[in-house]
Amino acid sequence: MFESFNVPGLYIAVQAVLALAASWTSRQVGERTLTGIVIDSGDGVTHVIPVAEGYVIGSCIKHIPIAGRDITYFIQQLLREREVGIPPEQSLETAKAIKEKYCYICPDIVKEFAKYDVDPQKWIKQYTGINAINQKKFVIDVGYERFLGPEIFFHPEFANPDSMESISDVVDEVIQNCPIDVRRPLYKMEQIPLSYPQGHGFHPLSPPFH
């Protein structure tokens, strides 16, 4: 690589450390540090990764089987229950698009329900899709799904009655498993960059996050 492409230099870094550095661009992050908890959520699994002074504490990493795919399935289920007129063969694709475009994490689910009930015109969005068979447009209202989808991280029982361990519990467990001298800094600087999905509202979370 260096000889063929004349690359002047190369720096290899751990993704979790880079995620912490990237979180510095958020207004919610006060102090710039490479100590914190990184939640790396992909399509099928979510990892909780403790980082202390730029070093990943590998022995304390935990994972949970809730990730982006589960949010999509849950939103799909919510839309089906409302019978909003989505073509059946496009329900999964529509749920994924709604997740990536409209979903966000809320600090208080009860207050969020109240917001939508008091002023639905302000919070309910409309999604427009094209029926793949007849090429006609279909429009659906997107309401509670906007925050209920990501809420399964904190209330996994919403999507699966057998899943009882929330992301909050896992984060606390990960920190408690870390060396005692880094626990306080981890709790203090708990910044959680969600790497998936890259939709509106998926910003670093600061404590208390649920």
Swiss-Prot record:
Where is it made, tissue-wise? Expressed in kidney, stomach, spleen, bone marrow, uterus, testis, placenta, skeletal muscle, mammary gland, lung, fetal liver, and fetal kidney, but not detected in small intestine, brain, and thymus. Expressed in low-metastatic lung adenocarcinoma cells but not in high-metastatic ones.
Keywords, A to Z? Actin-binding, ATP-binding, Nucleotide-binding, Signal
Would I find Glycoprotein among this entry's keywords? no
- Answer yes or no on keyword ATP-binding: yes
Please give the Gene Ontology molecular function terms for this protein. actin binding; ATP binding
Q: Name one GO cellular component term.
A: extracellular exosome
Listed InterPro entries = Actin, ATPase_NBD
What span is annotated as the signal peptide, if there is one?
1-21
Q: What does this protein do?
A: May play a role in the suppression of metastatic potential in lung adenoma carcinoma cells.
The family classification in the record reads: Belongs to the actin family.
Q: Report the protein name in the record.
A: Actin-related protein 3C
Q: Which organism is it from?
A: Homo sapiens
Gene name? ACTR3C
